[in-house]
């Protein structure tokens, strides 16, 4: 667990440097060196259930609806499959995400998540297909930890701390999503219900720093709302769980 411990000491140090009264994003998060060595012994090999704000329940499908940048109708399904994939010697759960725009499938993605023994959920990559008129036209955004310099990131901390920022993925120049914890006591109302004690994150891509989303994660449920707050418009809200 030494390497993971070093990773979180770095995060804690970055959080300590943040001004509690400053709501701005970290000035240059890309300036912080990112390096993590993965030891498969630090990760669960079975019974992967996620954590409070990112539960992993095999067989569940979350359905989100909303609007895109140009007002198009968006529908996203997120299915927690019973399939796994070994990446860097770590067992990852495969989660399939399908995005529809005006009822047409535009993206089909398989995400790979793992859980360490401290309860943090890691993101080991994705296989993504862009689709037009039923035909695959690209695989932009695809990456796999351990390949071509890519490293896994944290998709959800077991114990998120306000003001802390962290990398969710890392392939230099290709996949550089990061998140900053804004609150662990937020509220969110969506078609599926109203929730208190939510985690509110600012999430953005270092390659597109002018575009920022706020995401709300309900305890015991996971992501319930994502809304663009800078650079773009659009919102997705949880409407159903199957």
Label each PLM-derived region with a short phrase.
Residues 18-242:
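Conserved functional acidic sites
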């Amino acid at each position: 667990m030494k390497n993971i411990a070093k990773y979180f000491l770095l995060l804690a140090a970055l959080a300590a440097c943040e001004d509690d009264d400053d709501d701005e994003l970290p000035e240059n998060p890309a300036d912080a060196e990112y390096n993590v060595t993965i030891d498969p012994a630090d990760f669960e090999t079975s019974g992967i259930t996620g954590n409070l704000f990112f539960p992993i329940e095999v067989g569940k499908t979350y359905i989100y609806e909303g609007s895109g940048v140009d007002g198009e109708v968006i529908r996203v399904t997120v299915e927690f499959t019973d399939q796994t994939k070994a990446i860097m010697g770590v067992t990852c759960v495969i989660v399939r995400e399908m995005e529809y725009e005006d009822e047409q499938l535009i993206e089909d993605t398989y995400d790979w998540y793992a859980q360490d023994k401290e309860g943090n959920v890691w993101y080991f990559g994705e296989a993504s297909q862009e689709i037009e008129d039923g035909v695959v036209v690209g695989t932009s955004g695809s990456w796999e930890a351990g390949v071509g310099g890519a490293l896994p990131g944290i998709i959800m901390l077991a114990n998120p701390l306000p003001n802390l920022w962290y990398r969710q993925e890392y392939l230099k120049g290709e996949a550089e999503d990061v998140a900053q914890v804004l609150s662990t006591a937020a509220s969110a109302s969506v078609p599926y219900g109203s929730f208190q004690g939510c985690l509110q994150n600012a999430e953005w891509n270092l390659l597109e720093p002018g575009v920022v989303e706020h995401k709300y994660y309900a305890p015991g449920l996971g992501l319930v709302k994502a809304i663009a707050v800078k650079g773009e418009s659009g919102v997705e809200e949880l409407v159903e769980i199957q």
